Amino acid sequence: MGQKVNPIGLRIGITRNWDSVWFSKQDYIKNLHEDIKIRRFLQKKFKNASVVKIIIERFPEKINVNLHTSKPGMVIGQKGQNIEAVKQELKKFADKPIGMNIIEVKKPEIIAQAIAETVALQIEQRMPFRRVMKAELRRAMRGGVEGVKIQISGRLNGADMARTEKYMEGRVPLHTLRAKIDFGFKEALTTFGQIGVKVWTYTGDYFPTKEESDEDKYAVKRRTS
């Protein structure tokens, strides 16, 4: 099961929090579609800015968008011009004021989505895919991960038949739910068609603190009483 399912979705509530932080009964469908449109717009707008995560928080009077990127200068622009322009464009997706927070990713070499985007970009630039994959593996291991796996699929080097190749260093325990597994996916658009890039990184196991364990015990006791 761990080999097939998205490792982030499998660990929601265990090692990873939700990317959409809100709850609604009546407007669930409306809010969900707004979130999808906002994410697609920002990913397309800043496709070269290495955006690794977009977290959307909803409040009664406003919406907060937290954009995690390794290139904040490219997103913000000169004197914040890009942000103001984006805020104006985002107004058409929601009927509430939208605020944006730009959060810099300090170590993009260990973030799976950033690695996937780097590999896809170099494949589009016709770099040898094996050299690119091995270089990113070494960079991630030097960055401090305990394991990393990179897999690419498609017409590699323009071959007539599509195939899959993968390289791995360290260990990536996909079946261990407490393992902090990050996952990234990106498609490289080449003259021979699309090449899919998948990346898994493992940065150790998650063990809750005593305070978190006490909170869990209290929550279970409250549900059963």
Swiss-Prot record:
The keyword NAD does not apply. GO terms for molecular function: mRNA binding; rRNA binding; structural constituent of ribosome. The keyword Hydrolase does not apply. InterPro entries: KH_dom, KH_dom-like_a/b, KH_dom_type_2, KH_sf_prok-type, Ribosomal_S3_C_sf, Ribosomal_uS3_bac-typ, Ribosomal_uS3_C, Ribosomal_uS3_CS. Transmembrane segments: none annotated. Binds the lower part of the 30S subunit head. Binds mRNA in the 70S ribosome, positioning it for translation. Belongs to the universal ribosomal protein uS3 family. Pfam families: KH_2, Ribosomal_S3_C. It comes from the Bacteria. This is Small ribosomal subunit protein uS3. Gene3D superfamilies: 3.30.300.20, Ribosomal protein S3, C-terminal domain (3.30.1140.32). One of its GO terms (biological process) is translation. PANTHER family: 30S/40S RIBOSOMAL PROTEIN S3 (PTHR11760), SMALL RIBOSOMAL SUBUNIT PROTEIN US3C (PTHR11760:SF19). Part of the 30S ribosomal subunit. Forms a tight complex with proteins S10 and S14. GO terms for cellular component: cytosolic small ribosomal subunit.
